C-alpha cells in the first residue's frame, strides 16, 4: 500500500510521529509538508488503494488556523486515513474532531486517530518527547489502524464552530546576535518575518519555529513576562500524560 504523510509541523514534533507511523507501513512513503508557505495551496487526489496519515499540532485546543486551509486541496476517493494530533501535555480538546470533520468532507475514511504528546512550544514541558517509546507505540498503532476496516472508537471532542485563534500571545524577538542568514524568513510558515528579520506580530502564529531553528539563538523570548509565564506553565504541566490511540 502506498502511504503519504501529510503534516504541519513548525517545531518537528508532528513530523517525527507521523513519519514514524508512515515508515512502519511503507518504507518508501511520500511526504507532503504543508508547513512551508509554498505548500499552502498544494493539490493532490488520492485513490482508495492508498493510505494517508494526517498530522497537526494543537494550538489552544484546535488545529492551527493557518494550517486548516492547507488541507483543502487534498482530496480522497474513499481513501483510508489515520489522524494524529500532537499537543504539549495540556489537552487536545477538539483538535481530533476538527481533523476528522475536514478529512471526511474531503473524501477520506478514518481508520484510526491518535492524540500524541510532544514538547510544548512554551516553557520546558515534556522535553524529549516524542521519545523512542512514544514512536514505537505510534508504529504499532499505525499497523493496527492500517488493517482496521471500520473504527469502533468514537473520536473525542466536537467539531468546533467559527475560526480558530490566529496564534498565541508571545511573539519572538530578534537580538543583535542575528547574522541575517535568512533561515527564519525562509522557513516561517506564515511569512511573518520581514526584510529586517524582525517578526511581524500581526502575522506571527507563535509557533516558535524561528526560535528552534536559529543557528545563533538570536530569535528568543527573553522577557521577564515570558520567563515568569514559562516557569508557571512548566510547573503546571509537569505531570506526564500518555498518548491516546483510537481504533
Model-derived features with residue positions:
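Iron-sulfur cluster-binding cysteine motifs and their immediate structural context
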Residues: 174, 179-205, 209-226
Amino acid at each position: 500500500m502506498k502511504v503519504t504523510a501529510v503534516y504541519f509541523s513548525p517545531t518537528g514534533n508532528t513530523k517525527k510521529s507521523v513519519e514514524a507511523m508512515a515508515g512502519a507501513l511503507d518504507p518508501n512513503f511520500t511526504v507532503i509538508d504543508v508547513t512551508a508557505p509554498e505548500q499552502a495551496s498544494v493539490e493532490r487526489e488520492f485513490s482508495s488503494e492508498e493510505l494517508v496519515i494526517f498530522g497537526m499540532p494543537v494550538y489552544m485546543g484546535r488545529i492551527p488556523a493557518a494550517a486548516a486551509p492547507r488541507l483543502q486541496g487534498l482530496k480522497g476517493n474513499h481513501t483510508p486515513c489515520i489522524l494524529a494530533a500532537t499537543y504539549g501535555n495540556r489537552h487536545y480538546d477538539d483538535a481530533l474532531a476538527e481533523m476528522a470533520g475536514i478529512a471526511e468532507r474531503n473524501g477520506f475514511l478514518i481508520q484510526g486517530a491518535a492524540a500524541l504528546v510532544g514538547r510544548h512550544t512554551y516553557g520546558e514541558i515534556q522535553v524529549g518527547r516524542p521519545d523512542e517509546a512514544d514512536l514505537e507505540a505510534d508504529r504499532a498503532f499505525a499497523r493496527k489502524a492500517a488493517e482496521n476496516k471500520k473504527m469502533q472508537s468514537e473520536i473525542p471532542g466536537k467539531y468546533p464552530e467559527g475560526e480558530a485563534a490566529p496564534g498565541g500571545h508571545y511573539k519572538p524577538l530578534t537580538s543583535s546576535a542575528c547574522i541575517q542568514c535568512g533561515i527564519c524568513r525562509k522557513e516561517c510558515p506564515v511569512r511573518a518575518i520581514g526584510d529586517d528579520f524582525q517578526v511581524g506580530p500581526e502575522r506571527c502564529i507563535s509557533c516558535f519555529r524561528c526560535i528552534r531553528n536559529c543557528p545563533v539563538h538570536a530569535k528568543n523570548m527573553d522577557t521577564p513576562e515570558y520567563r515568569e509565564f514559562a516557569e508557571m506553565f512548566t510547573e503546571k504541566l509537569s505531570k506526564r500524560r500518555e498518548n491516546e490511540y483510537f481504533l
